Amino acid sequence: MAVPKKRKSKMKTRLRKAQWKSEASREAAKALSKAKTVIKSLLAANSANLESNSENSN
């Protein structure tokens, strides 16, 4: 005869969900920080190239 599964408590479910969300939030913050670093380095390299090109043309 089929027996229903034992239910997990809401507290355990909420704790697991909160843990997952906090880890995801940390990873998202890391990814954003890395993206900002890459963009800053690209902008710095681009501005350096523009300055050297303007000096060479003068």
From Swiss-Prot:
GO MF term set: structural constituent of ribosome
Gene Ontology cellular component terms for the protein in this record: chloroplast; large ribosomal subunit
Pfam families reported in the protein's UniProt record: Ribosomal_L32p
Name of the gene: rpl32
Signal peptide span: none
Record organism: Chlorella vulgaris (Green alga)
Keyword Ribonucleoprotein: yes
Comp. bias (Basic residues): 1-19
Protein name in the entry: Large ribosomal subunit protein bL32c
Positions of the UniProt region annotated as Disordered: 1-25
Similarity comment text for this entry: Belongs to the bacterial ribosomal protein bL32 family.
Keyword line: Chloroplast, Plastid, Ribonucleoprotein, Ribosomal protein
Subcellular localization(s) per the UniProt record: Plastid, Chloroplast
SUPFAM superfamilies: Zn-binding ribosomal proteins (SSF57829)
GO terms for biological process, alphabetical: translation
